[in-house]
Each structure stands twice: as structure tokens, then as C-alpha cells.
Amino acid sequence: MKAVIFFCLLSVMVFTVIEAVKEEGTKPAEAARECAAKNKRCADWAGPWCCEGLYCSCRSYPGCMCRPNSG
């Protein structure tokens, strides 16, 4: 009886971990759709990331802002 209960608990734990990993895998894709516009706050290491044609300038942390590319 203890073995059956242990197996059930173990199965639930494994299922929970698998679902958490699946959800975590979708977060970067969702975050990639959103971008920060010119003069908005950004963070290259964690997001929000700057829109295309902009880069994240951190002249004074934590005041990082999206600036236009100069090239």
C-alpha cells in the first residue's frame, strides 16, 4: 500500500515538473514579441528588449534606455 501511494506521489511530482518546464520554454517566445520603443526602459539581459533599429544603452544603471542605432 505504501508503494502505491509513493508511486502516485512520484507520478504527480514528475508531471508537475514536466508541465513547469513546458511553460518556461514558451516565455522567451512570448517576451520576444514585445519590444521597448525609443527612449523607453530596457534590459538586454532580461527584457524588455529594444525594438528593431534600436539598442539598449546603459549610461547609468538602472536607467537603461532604447536608443537609435547610429549606423
UniProtKB/Swiss-Prot annotation:
Residues 21-33 form a propeptide. Expressed by the venom gland. Pfam families: Toxin_7. Keywords: Amidation, Disulfide bond, Ion channel impairing toxin, Knottin, Neurotoxin, Secreted, Signal, Toxin, Voltage-gated sodium channel impairing toxin. Transmembrane segments: none annotated. The modification Serine amide is found at S70. Insecticidal neurotoxin that modulates the insect Nav channel (DmNaV1/tipE (para/tipE)) in a unique manner, with both the activation and inactivation processes being affected. The voltage dependence of activation is shifted toward more hyperpolarized potentials (analogous to site 4 toxins) and a non-inactivating persistent sodium current is induced (site 3-like action). Interestingly, both effects take place in a voltage-dependent manner, producing a bell-shaped curve between -80 and 0 mV. Negative results: does not affect mammalian sodium channels (Nav). The presence of a 'disulfide through disulfide knot' structurally defines this protein as a knottin. This is U3-agatoxin-Ao1a. It comes from Agelena orientalis. The lineage of its organism: Eukaryota, Metazoa, Ecdysozoa, Arthropoda, Chelicerata.
